[in-house]
A protein has these predicted regions:
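Conserved alpha-helix/loop element of class I SAM-dependent methyltransferases that forms part
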Residues: 5-36, 47
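Class I SAM-dependent methyltransferase SAM/SAH-binding core
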Residues: 36-92
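A short acidic, Gly/Pro-enriched loop at the edge of an enzyme's catalytic core
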Residues: 91-104
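A short SAM/SAH-binding and catalytic strip from SAM-dependent methyltransferases
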Residues: 102-117
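A short glycine-rich, Lys/Arg-flanked "PGG" loop and its adjoining helix->strand segment in the class I
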Residues: 117-132
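Conserved class I S-adenosyl-L-methionine
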Residues: 132-158
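Short alpha-helix
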Residues: 158-180
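Core SAM-dependent methyltransferase catalytic element
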Residues: 173-176, 189-206
Length: 206
């Protein structure tokens, strides 16, 4: 199994992992200029919140790790951009009013231990109507295999939320999925299973 959470990113594009296509290719985030964006969990050595600020967004980020926040704050200083950082659990979004965020992004933070229902409800609350919630997780099928060995080593859903569980949680939180990418590593186009699942869901209702 691969752990994409700590993959290195270079800050030049919104990243879903160092071995898969970024948003310059997928275009699920799109143009973030002048948008108020929220990164849920700091991903990479240069977090996506810094990258989005470099691209003209008004960036906000939250992460439970003080060390991650300090490191990301320094990355923002080094990049000469302003990012509003908060230390706390991803669903602890009480510092945000209702319907104030134009885009929410969560890359490789959702696990079996995540209270997905609460997180998705809180993201729905802070997003503007029809705004996008984009998240990336290790593809559930990638956890079944070890590398490119086609022998199943674990049961589907034993170590990661299944696609069905994620889809149902989004539906119950009043989101509608409009984009889903099952990404294989760019250097392994014939891999046994996709390594990364990227989903964009739109907020329904107010």
């Amino acid at each position: 199994m691969s752990d994409a959470r700590w993959s290195v990113t270079d800050g030049r594009a919104i990243s879903f992992g160092s071995t898969v296509s970024n948003d310059d290719d997928l275009r699920v985030c799109g143009d973030v200029r002048n948008k108020r964006v929220l990164e849920l969990g700091l991903f990479g050595t240069i977090p996506n919140c810094v990258t989005m600020a470099q691209r003209g967004a008004r960036s906000i980020a939250i992460d439970p790790s003080r060390e991650n926040v300090q490191r990301a704050r320094q990355a923002a200083v080094n990049s000469e951009v302003s990012v509003e950082f908060h230390e706390g659990e991803l669903a602890d979004l009480g510092f945000l009013m209702n319907a104030v965020i134009d885009l929410a992004l969560c890359v490789h933070q959702v696990t079996l231990d995540t209270d997905i229902a609460r997180l998705f409800r809180q993201v729905h609350r802070v997003l503007r109507p029809e705004a996008g919630f984009i998240f990336a997780v290790p593809h559930p099928m990638s956890a079944v295999f070890d590398g490119n060995d086609a022998t199943a080593r674990r049961r589907y859903g034993d170590t990661t939320p299944t696609i069905g569980e994620l889809a149902m949680a989004l539906q119950r939180a009043n989101f509608s999925i409009d984009v889903m990418h099952e990404l294989k590593p760019t250097h392994q186009p014939n891999a046994v299973a996709p390594s990364t699942l990227v989903v964009r869901a739109r907020k329904l209702g107010s």
